[in-house]
């Protein structure tokens, strides 16, 4: 932290499940998750630092502008395989998903798929950026990424007639919303608490918003 040079921060990736396990084992002081905790993870102390929408993305040239959540579930389960059933071209849908253990995948599974598995024929990638790149170069593909990562390379579908936006996330009309969590073993203290307090401060929340996430304060 530039304002507190005595506090060093080492950030490692690996997905939400890795963040949860690292926190539970004591391998880190702050774990991170971009999905809700599972029942067997609730022994951790969780702090919501931001919220984020999940966007269902397609190539900008795709004439399909929206879908229902039920249709999205059918696409990712492999039951709906052609764009013509959504008013698009008579072309097979290329499905792109995230890897197991990803918080984005976990949130999508919980919010869209429920107990239904994503079908085996889907292309699996290990980052939101890679999913976006594939969709940006395949006119007949579909994937899901953080709403904050949607750019001019791809287009987000309206879901059940609602566009993903900060306003619609805050008013509850856009349903694909997940938390960004900090996790600790018990109430945070010392430098850990100082860092979390900074993230929740006006300055920290402004940085959250700058990164495309929805501040909680």
Regions found by a protein language model. Give the residues of each.
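Exported/periplasmic ABC-transporter solute-binding proteins
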Residues: 1-217
């Amino acid at each position: 932290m530039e304002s507190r040079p005595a506090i060093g921060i080492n950030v490692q990736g690996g997905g939400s499940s890795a963040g949860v396990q690292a926190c539970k084992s004591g391998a880190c002081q702050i774990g991170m998750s971009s999905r809700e905790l599972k029942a067997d993870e609730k022994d951790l102390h969780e702090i919501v630092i931001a919220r984020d929408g999940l966007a269902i993305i397609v190539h900008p040239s795709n004439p399909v502008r929206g879908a229902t959540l039920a249709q999205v579930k059918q696409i990712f389960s492999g039951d709906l395989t052609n764009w013509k059933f959504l008013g698009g071209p008579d072309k097979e849908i290329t499905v792109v998903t995230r890897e197991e253990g990803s918080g984005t995948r976990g949130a999508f599974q919980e919010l869209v798929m429920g107990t239904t598995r994503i079908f085996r024929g889907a292309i699996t990638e290990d980052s939101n950026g890679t999913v976006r790149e594939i969709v940006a170069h395949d006119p007949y593909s579909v994937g899901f990424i953080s709403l904050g990562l949607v750019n001019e390379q791809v287009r987000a579908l309206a879901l059940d007639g609602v566009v993903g936006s900060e306003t619609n996330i805050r008013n509850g009309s856009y349903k694909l919303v997940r938390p960004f969590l900090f996790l600790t073993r018990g109430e945070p203290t010392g430098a850990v608490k100082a860092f979390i307090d900074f993230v929740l401060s006006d300055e920290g929340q402004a940085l959250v918003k700058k990164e495309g996430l929805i501040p909680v304060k």
